[in-house]
């Protein structure tokens, strides 16, 4: 496809922004159009059979009305998506075509949550029902998770395994961490879950210090089983286990692999029957739906894991079939492009008003920034426009007492997403906490929109004139409010994640970049291997710049290995 800035819709949007966007005032738009909310809000409904509030369905309301757009703006943004081939690229992904063009791979994580079991093929092979395919792996996960949870699968001394340590990094860590935290309400009360990702020895040391080898199960999550950080931590865990058990511990009962490299897995000592595989068309940041989600199934139970997949599948179907103007992830994506490329916004705030979602911004950070942190378009030329935004966030109301100052009164435009569930899993104090949370969720979006003028500050009385400008809020700051109509359960969480997945897809499709590779993580890893050897050799290494050489020498001096 053509670079985004060569499309006629792009030029049209530039003119439109100059004429309308620069002078658009949100609060005036609401005053002039009482129907603005209904015109710009969209509702996604989860079926009752997977809803956390079954037998009732769950609505998820996406309010786009507090964004800096008119109906004309939205039409022009939809036309940009059409010209950029978003629908064609979407259909190619769902058809198993190799849209990851730099690695010649399909992008088929949607198959992992294909709970309706529609036929899905890559290179003519049905990935759902082939040997080692999606359904076989899911069945293996179901059987294993139920055996561990029931106590049928025991440790080497016959005790139930209640301490789960997942060792992985990147997508093999961020997804499971986020999901198990988000679904903590559904977690097994007799189970402790720990995640080790960092090669910093502190991470594995602290996890092991709090563990009993007789009741600990290790999940080693690495597709290739060669990821440096993961295998280093896995070997440390193995040594600890054998030392603590006096060499009597049975590795096959306490270690399983989420991997496809049988040779390395069995060499490590894990029984090949305890391998849970996934294909090359599963990118790391999309792998929580795969065998990498085994920790989720163990913690919340396979039935809830299946609902998690089903909620994701429901949003997949919406994205695949809804017209662009009614397509909720597409709307989120084109709004992101609008702010990034026409308002020069560099960041995007994710603020969940839900403590269980405290790792959601970090998860979305990887999803967005690893996908769209690219500067080269499909023809190999440099993009002549901004691509992926910097995604950040923290749960509210905590965030209101840290960086919200900058969001309200800083010099940068920061589009924000606010997320709230109407019902709390912990409705304590007669729902007082939930009411306070909701009031802040509503108030922050309103405050960012309406602001406060100098006249309004003066009208409050007793404000010295020299303080008036400091108490002014410019307002006109855009937000998208997402309201889950019930609790955030497995299906609701699945749908929310997939909303952001396909929003990210839409951005990348418009920017004409490959959202599915991650070459940017490679260079540092290559250099680290060289430097690791040099740390054990005399001198300050070779071939480095003066700064790196100087730092290496200083480190070796101070570390005194």
Swiss-Prot record:
One record GO biological process: glucose 6-phosphate metabolic process
Residues reported in the UniProt entry to bind D-glucose 6-phosphate: 171-172, 222-227, 366, 370, 401, 525
Broad class of the protein's primary localization: cytoplasm
Pathway listed: Carbohydrate degradation; glycolysis; D-glyceraldehyde 3-phosphate and glycerone phosphate from D-glucose: step 2/4
Assembly, per entry: Homodimer.
Function: In the cytoplasm, catalyzes the conversion of glucose-6-phosphate to fructose-6-phosphate, the second step in glycolysis, and the reverse reaction during gluconeogenesis.
Designated name of the protein: Glucose-6-phosphate isomerase
Naturally occurring in which organism (per UniProt): Neurospora crassa (strain ATCC 24698 / 74-OR23-1A / CBS 708.71 / DSM 1257 / FGSC 987)
Lineage: Eukaryota, Fungi, Dikarya, Ascomycota, Pezizomycotina
